[in-house]
Amino acid sequence: MGVDVLFGNAKFTGRNTLELDGKEIKFRRAMICAGGRPFVPDIPGLRENCLTSESFFELTELPKNFMVIGGGPIGCELAHAMRRLGSEVTVLQRGDKIMDKDDPAAGEIVLDVFKEEGIDVRFGSELQKVEPRDGRLCCTIKHGDHEHELVVDKIMVATGRIPNVESLDLEAAGVEYHRRGIKVDKHHRTTNKRIFAAGDICSPFQFTHAAYAQAEYATLNALMPWPYRLNAKDRVMSWVTYTDPEVAHAGPPYSEIEKQKANLDTYELPIKDNDRAQTESEHRGFCKIHCKKGTDKIIAATIVGENAGEMIAEMSLAITQGMRLRQIQESVHAYPTRAEIIRNTATEWKFSTLTSSMKSMVGVWFKISRMFG
């Protein structure tokens, strides 16, 4: 294919030059995809005694007592997995809720499951220090004005990710960045017009599928002339938290939905109203669709339930293509499937469009029909 693959440590030396292990390389275009890494808080004894999402899967034995720092998606996923494998699990969460970037109703459902299954979630709690003790780890935890100790076998840190910007000498290339990563425009171009970036090093969406999508657009934009460049801001992002039940979302994040709620109409159905869910004794979850106020144009959606991650693809497609609830309501979904809850939620919108006079007319029509057979 004519692609040269060079291994080594690279850093920029100018706006169109970089150094790779002492060798200078010139470029017309460059792409930065250096990724990110788990953030480990600066807590005495933690860094040398913790697991992260990158080292967690190196475990070869099941720890009896397992502590997770952070109640976000990764923390909740691994806490749930370890509990079902048999560990006693404690989650330390500094705030007052888990999965605080998702719809609060979703977090409440997952929290209820955690409580039922014996996961100890401690809100308003912060780790102060970690000390090895007799082959285990003694953790000093602060809750309010009080401190106490908890001895565990393993500690998992799930407190977010940070971009790998330190060793690249971005200043030499005129590439601006901040604590969340490299600054990019809608075309994924940095402040140096020759250099583009994609993935965890520049994105608020730190998912594998997000990095792939961004790299796709960034590469095309780096190679194409200006009029043909693709607008990455137009892409709809979706994501899934793999707890049980799963939590899936498509569209702007919940924080944006909350800001726009005065301009949105929301339609919702509980998963227990879905026949397939009933046959499998599933009662936790919901489908919630947000539309532009006064219309059926879909803005965002959240689905909580078994296989929610599979169902959210339909909503991601609908939002991307500017579809409306009318089109979903008119489509025929197979019965009995969980995905049918999406169409039934769209039917809730359909019912909401019936005015009182229309309902009265329908009632009169039924009466007349019964009178005359």
Predicted regions and their residues:
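Flexible, glycine-rich terminal cap/loop adjacent to redox cofactors
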Residues: 243-253, 258-373
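Glycine-rich dinucleotide-binding loop and its adjacent helix/turn
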Residues: 34-94, 117, 171-191
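Rossmann-like dinucleotide-binding cores of NAD(P)H-dependent redox enzymes
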Residues: 57-58, 63-67, 73-148, 204-212, ...
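Feature captures the FAD/FMN-dependent oxidoreductase FAD-binding
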Residues: 1-29, 121, 128-139
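Short loop/edge segments at beta-strand edges and connector loops
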Residues: 7-9, 14, 34, 52-54, ...
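FAD-site-proximal beta/loop scaffold in flavoenzymes
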Residues: 48-63, 149-228, 329
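Short, acidic, Ser/Thr-enriched surface-loop or helix-capping motifs
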Residues: 7, 185-186, 292-293
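Short hydrophobic core segments
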Residues: 10, 24-35, 68-69, 89, ...
